């Protein structure tokens, strides 16, 4: 896991962030914006694969689509993919028209069924995609990378953003010879984690690599931000020493 903290500008008094008037104290204060970014190596992939079958009637189209999906599910089970990681209930049938001379002519029906697979062993990715095509599933809709435990990375990013805000405030207070006071207000920016789409990429002049290596695995980034208003207090003055009696 790669970890980094990004510091944004922190301002004295009025900051660039859109703070409401009642979010700022009347007295001296500091506004800081703490941010952090945590990079995680993907450990799961979500596959969406579709079968699209045409036939003379809807029942036949559905039957053929079901047979192909059943064949692929058997393949997945042979590859130790748990049933809870397989979803195949999505099915739709629709009329299939041919258009000639501005007229629509019914030529049959189509059945479309989607299989979604959560893959927890990324080294099996290529074989699962090949298996889908061999089973007659004719469209790979998407392959997205993610992490199995995103909350753990979100918590790390949030804690780092809080630490970053406190560090900025403390440094500014010290620089202006003030004492950092209590927190007056906090504004938290809820960040959304999105799985990263995986793209098969291959340069023409690249050295030979295995088929599995042609699937790039970009890091998943978890960003967090928290804006904090701290009150400022004057540094305690040392009492003047009384001259010693002569």
From Swiss-Prot:
InterPro entries in UniProt: 26kDa_periplasmic_antigen (IPR052022), SIMPL/DUF541 (IPR007497)
Domain of life of the source: Bacteria
Gene3D superfamilies registered for this protein in UniProt: Protein of unknown function (DUF541), domain 1, Protein of unknown function (DUF541), domain 2
Pfam families per UniProt: SIMPL
GO terms, biological process: cellular response to heat; cellular response to reactive oxygen species; DNA damage response
UniProt protein name: Uncharacterized protein YggE
Gene source species: Escherichia coli (strain K12)
Protein encoded by which gene: yggE
């Amino acid at each position: 896991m790669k970890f980094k903290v990004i510091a944004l500008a922190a301002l004295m008094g009025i900051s660039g962030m859109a703070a409401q008037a009642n979010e700022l104290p009347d007295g001296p204060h500091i506004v800081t914006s703490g941010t952090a970014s945590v990079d995680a190596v993907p450990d799961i992939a979500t596959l969406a694969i579709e079968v699209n079958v045409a036939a003379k009637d809807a029942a036949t189209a559905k039957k053929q689509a079901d047979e192909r999906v059943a064949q692929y599910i058997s393949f997945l089970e042979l590859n130790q993919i748990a049933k809870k990681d397989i979803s195949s209930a999505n099915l739709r049938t629709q009329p299939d028209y041919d258009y000639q001379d501005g007229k629509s002519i019914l030529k049959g029906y189509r059945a479309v069924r989607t299989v979604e697979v959560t893959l927890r062993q990324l080294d099996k990715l290529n074989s699962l995609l090949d298996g889908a095509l061999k089973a007659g599933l004719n469209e790979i809709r998407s392959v997205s990378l993610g992490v199995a435990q995103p909350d753990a990375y979100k918590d790390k990013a949030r804690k780092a953003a809080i630490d970053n805000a406190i560090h900025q405030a403390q440094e500014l207070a010290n620089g202006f010879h003030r004492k950092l006071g209590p927190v007056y207000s906090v504004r938290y920016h809820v960040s959304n984690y999105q799985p990263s789409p995986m793209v098969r990429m291959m340069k023409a002049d690249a050295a030979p690599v295995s088929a599995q290596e042609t699937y790039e695995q970009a890091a998943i980034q978890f960003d967090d931000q928290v804006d904090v208003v701290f009150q400022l207090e004057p540094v305690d003055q040392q009492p003047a020493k009384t001259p010693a009696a002569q």
